[in-house]
Design a protein with these regions (language model features):
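Short hydrophobic/aromatic-rich motifs at helix boundaries and adjacent loops
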Residues: 5-6, 13-15, 33, 62-65, ...
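Generic alpha-helical segment signature
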Residues: 7, 11, 54, 84, ...
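Conserved nucleic-acid-binding Ia/Ib motif block in the N-terminal RecA-like helicase ATPase lobe
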Residues: 16-20, 70-137
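Proline-centered helix-kink/hinge sites
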Residues: 26-28, 35-36, 60, 78-81, ...
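Walker A/P-loop NTP-binding motif
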Residues: 31-43, 53-69, 85, 89-95, ...
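The conserved Walker
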Residues: 47-51
C-alpha cells in the first residue's frame, strides 16, 4: 500500500484538494484503484462503507479530464439516487478544494428529464453522474 498520494502519481492540485478535506494518506482501496484508473484500466472493486471508494475513482478522473474542453468526458453510473447525490457532492467539493475547474451534473429520476437534458446541453459538464434508469431515459 502506498503511504501518500504523490506515490500514486496524482497531481499536486488534486493532492492539495484532498489535504483541504483532511485526507492525507490513501486508504487501501485508493492505493489499489488510483494507479489503475490513471492507466485507463477497467476496474471492479469492493470495499466497506467509508473506505474512500468515491475518491478512489473521482480523484484520478480529475487528472484525466481536459478542463479546456467544454464537453462531457466522464459518465458515472450509481445504483441509487442517494449515491448519485453523494458522488456529485464529492466532485464539487474536490473541484473547489483543488481549484481544478471540473464541472458536474447529477441526473436523477425524481427530477424533470426535460430540464435535466436542457441543463446538460447548456452547461456541458465534464462529469455526468446518474442512476442507470435515468441515464437510459
Amino acid at each position: 500500500m502506498k503511504n501518500n498520494f504523490n506515490e500514486l502519481n496524482l497531481n499536486s492540485n488534486i493532492i492539495l484538494g484532498l489535504e483541504k478535506q483532511g485526507i492525507t494518506v490513501p486508504t487501501e482501496i485508493q492505493s489499489l484503484v488510483i494507479p489503475n484508473v490513471l492507466e485507463n484500466k477497467d476496474i471492479i472493486a469492493e470495499a466497506y462503507t467509508g473506505s474512500g471508494k468515491t475518491l478512489a475513482f473521482v480523484a484520478p478522473l480529475f487528472q484525466k479530464i481536459d478542463t479546456s474542453k467544454r464537453e462531457s468526458q466522464v459518465l458515472i453510473l450509481a445504483p441509487t439516487h442517494e449515491l448519485v447525490i453523494q458522488i456529485t457532492e464529492q466532485i464539487k467539493l474536490l473541484a473547489k478544494n483543488s481549484e481544478v475547474p471540473v464541472t458536474s451534473l447529477s441526473i436523477i429520476g425524481e427530477a424533470s428529464i426535460e430540464k435535466q437534458i436542457k441543463k446538460i446541453k447548456e452547461t456541458k459538464p465534464h462529469m455526468v453522474v446518474g442512476s442507470a434508469g435515468r441515464i437510459l431515459d
